[in-house]
Amino acid sequence: MWVCSTLWRVRTPARQWRGLLPASGCHGPAASSYSASAEPARVRALVYGHHGDPAKVVELKNLELAAVRGSDVRVKMLAAPINPSDINMIQGNYGFLPELPAVGGNEGVAQVVAVGSNVTGLKPGDWVIPANAGLGTWRTEAVFSEEALIQVPSDIPLQSAATLGVNPCTAYRMLMDFEQLQPGDSVIQNASNSGVGQAVIQIAAALGLRTINVVRDRPDIQKLSDRLKSLGAEHVITEEELRRPEMKNFFKDMPQPRLALNCVGGKSSTELLRQLARGGTMVTYGGMAKQPVVASVSLLIFKDLKLRGFWLSQWKKDHSPDQFKELILTLCDLIRRGQLTAPACSQVPLQDYQSALEASMKPFISSKQILTM
């Protein structure tokens, strides 16, 4: 299997209300493209004023757009997904929470409409994505600082650009940062049909890694298995199959995994640990089951397993903006080669946000909801 050498080389151990009026920090003279006396532009945004059930607390509102100053960039949002982290943030269950009221959405792609006089790295027509979480992407237009945005090539598919900044980055870093994997090594993961899971399958295949992909049983399990295998998955098994003694037969023809990726917790994480090779690592990046990770004492002692966690926001804090930009460009190269595609998506107009929010929280929904503006 062809292995992209660039992939192996990149191995490195605001508020959301910003840009809308009224808000503290909204400012005076417009950029040269705008008249300071012009009527403020009106934009639509999905706003929540308190934490709770997203389907109940999120509202579509008309808001005024702030003027563009020297270091600002006005953008038109093109598409923005609904991720689990977005839901958790609205519910009030996340690693950081924006000041309220806030605009929802941590990810998406936008097109630059105008720039301030001090902006040097962007121009109208460029595509951009958020540099960090918390920007508030569920809106039609916004004014952000130049440093809050990262340019991405406009020759990649819109859905790929809209879903580039969170899940593929998480997948790539987990594959690269915790074990020194080599082509032919194997990786096991749960929640394999999630956005991160699908990215793991594809990036692992590009790296020459073999994957064991665990999913919950469901009526259309064969259809799901076929789709994941079309992405590059070597094995797709259910949670029930993972618990069977026959699992040991997997490792007659492939090495035991040195890396396990856990997005579920509870019994599922315990079973992942059981499959790891001695000295292997399980990385937890989510907790869909809302149950603690349970690690067998004997596994920790006799197999010397390691338990780690990963949060992309923390990785960004620990690394420079240039390193994140390099990561984005590496993933864009994969997209251009056809080795990384967007997860299965359903595009939903912004005004139909209620149905999109409800669908994103239903079990066994493999299609990511993407809001289009």
Curated annotation (Swiss-Prot):
Effect of residue 232 to E: In DYTOABG; probably decreased protein abundance; partially functional in a Drosophila mecr mutant model
Binding site for NADP(+): 167, 193-196, 216-218, 285-288, 310-312, 368
Tissues of expression: Highly expressed in skeletal and heart muscle. Expressed at lower level in placenta, liver, kidney and pancreas. Weakly or not expressed in lung.
Modified residues (N6-succinyllysine): 61, 252, 267, 316
Active site residues according to the UniProt entry: 94
SMART domains: PKS_ER
Transit peptide, residues from-to: 1-53
Pfam families named in the record: ADH_N, ADH_zinc_N
InterPro entries in the record: ADH-like_C (IPR013149), ADH-like_N (IPR013154), GroES-like_sf (IPR011032), Mito_Enoyl-ACP_Reductase (IPR051034), NAD(P)-bd_dom_sf (IPR036291), PKS_ER (IPR020843)
Outcome (variant: residue 258 to W): In DYTOABG and OPA16; reduced protein levels in OPA16 patient cells; partially functional in a Drosophila mecr mutant model
Tree of life domain: Eukaryota
GO terms for biological process, alphabetical: ceramide biosynthetic process; fatty acid biosynthetic process; fatty acid metabolic process; intracellular iron ion homeostasis
Keywords of this entry: Acetylation, Cytoplasm, Disease variant, Dystonia, Fatty acid biosynthesis, Fatty acid metabolism, Lipid biosynthesis, Lipid metabolism, Mitochondrion, NADP, Nucleus, Oxidoreductase, Transit peptide
Enzyme Commission number(s): 1.3.1.104
Reaction equation(s) it catalyzes: a 2,3-saturated acyl-[ACP] + NADP(+) = a (2E)-enoyl-[ACP] + NADPH + H(+); (2E)-butenoyl-[ACP] + NADPH + H(+) = butanoyl-[ACP] + NADP(+); (2E)-hexenoyl-[ACP] + NADPH + H(+) = hexanoyl-[ACP] + NADP(+); (2E)-octenoyl-[ACP] + NADPH + H(+) = octanoyl-[ACP] + NADP(+)
Effect listed in the UniProt record for changing residue 85 to A: Reduces catalytic activity by 68%
Phenotype when changing residue 129 to M: Strongly increases activity with trans-oct-2-enoyl-CoA. No effect on activity with trans-tetradec-2-enoyl-CoA. Decreases activity with trans-hexadec-2-enoyl-CoA by 20%
Consequence the record notes for mutating residue 311 to L: Reduces catalytic activity by 87%. Strongly reduces affinity for trans-oct-2-enoyl-CoA
Positions of post-translational N6-acetyllysine modification: 61, 252, 267
GO CC terms, sorted: membrane; mitochondrial matrix; mitochondrion; nucleus
UniProt record similarity statement: Belongs to the zinc-containing alcohol dehydrogenase family. Quinone oxidoreductase subfamily.
Subunit structure comment from the entry: Homodimer. Isoform 2 interacts with PPARA in the nucleus and increases its activity.
Involvement in disorder: Dystonia, childhood-onset, with optic atrophy and basal ganglia abnormalities: An autosomal recessive neurologic disorder characterized by childhood-onset dystonia, basal ganglia degeneration and optic atrophy with decreased visual acuity. Dystonia is defined by the presence of sustained involuntary muscle contraction, often leading to abnormal postures. DYTOABG severity is variable, and some patients lose independent ambulation. Optic atrophy 16: A disease characterized by visual impairment in association with optic atrophy. Atrophy of the optic disk indicates a deficiency in the number of nerve fibers which arise in the retina and converge to form the optic disk, optic nerve, optic chiasm and optic tracts. OPA16 is an autosomal recessive form. Patients also show mild sensorineural hearing impairment.
PANTHER family on file: ENOYL-[ACYL-CARRIER-PROTEIN] REDUCTASE, MITOCHONDRIAL (PTHR43981:SF9)
Function: Catalyzes the NADPH-dependent reduction of trans-2-enoyl thioesters in mitochondrial fatty acid synthesis (fatty acid synthesis type II). Fatty acid chain elongation in mitochondria uses acyl carrier protein (ACP) as an acyl group carrier, but the enzyme accepts both ACP and CoA thioesters as substrates in vitro. Displays a preference for medium-chain over short- and long-chain substrates. May provide the octanoyl chain used for lipoic acid biosynthesis, regulating protein lipoylation and mitochondrial respiratory activity particularly in Purkinje cells.
Protein name: Enoyl-[acyl-carrier-protein] reductase, mitochondrial
Organism: Homo sapiens (Human)
Gene: MECR
